[in-house]
Amino acid sequence: MTAAKIIDKAILLLGYDTLKNTGSISGFEQSALTALNTVYADVFYLCNKEGFQEITDASQPVNMPENVVFDIMPYGVAAFLASSQGDSDNQLFFSRIYNLKRKNILKEMTFEDKIPTV
């Protein structure tokens, strides 16, 4: 999925889709890309140790597992976008959803317990 599609889903979740129809989204695009990169970095390091590269163009694909891209990232982007717009009710609502969903990434990871050899 591309960055633009994640941003579009977040905008739709927030009910800000009327911005697209009025043409007032142009100043909103940089905030949206910043929000996406913030969430992308957050979930990237839950799944990987290194290799993060910021998304610089909304047409770029987001290389994360499918469940992260479709089910987790849009809620985080929505939370940060709501915050940037001063929409505290939506910011709180989507932050809670994002944090609950983000916890599932850690549950899916397996940890191996090893006793060190001396």
Region locations from a protein language model:
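Structural motif
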Residues: V62-I72
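Short, hydrophobic/amphipathic alpha-helical patches that form generic packing surfaces
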Residues: D71-S83
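Mid-sequence acidic-hydrophobic segments that form the walls
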Residues: F80-S84, K101-E108
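Conserved short "hinge" loops at termini or chain/domain junctions
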Residues: M1-V62, L92, R96, K103-V118
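Charged, low-complexity interaction regions
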Residues: S84-N90
